[in-house]
């Protein structure tokens, strides 16, 4: 016994089968980075967030109150990270300095800019390039934690490095 399906059912079946097979294809990532660049970012401690890849060092880039100096060990680590990124074609980033709410807004803005510069320097030594608008002080405007506690203020005294596709 042979079933005779009308031509429209066969056509519909073939279209459905083609759509099902197309859905099984692997789609390359649309992040704007190559697989080698993503591997380098991950190996250096970057994590993907909504605005790019953010450096997430275990000791983080935290600062004592009213300080903008980076220790020699951190300078070397930052320079090494930059050199690794440059080796896979990532040659720039955004460096954002932040403060707690202690002090005036003007003082905190200047301090956060100095912190961003202190991190950008070793990155430049590692081969990265920056324009003036990529090294930014945010002052106290983007806190991670409440400034009501000493721990919260410590969390907010930081520098964030963000890498996005060129």
Q: Where would I find each of the regions flagged by the language model?
A:
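Bacterial N-terminal signal peptides that target proteins for export
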Residues: 2-13
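C-terminal motif of bacterial Sec signal peptides marking the signal peptidase cleavage site
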Residues: 19-23
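Bacterial signal peptide processing site
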Residues: 25-28
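N-terminal secretory signal peptides
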Residues: 30-56
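Envelope-exposed proteins and targeting segments
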Residues: 51-53, 57-59, 66, 89-91, ...
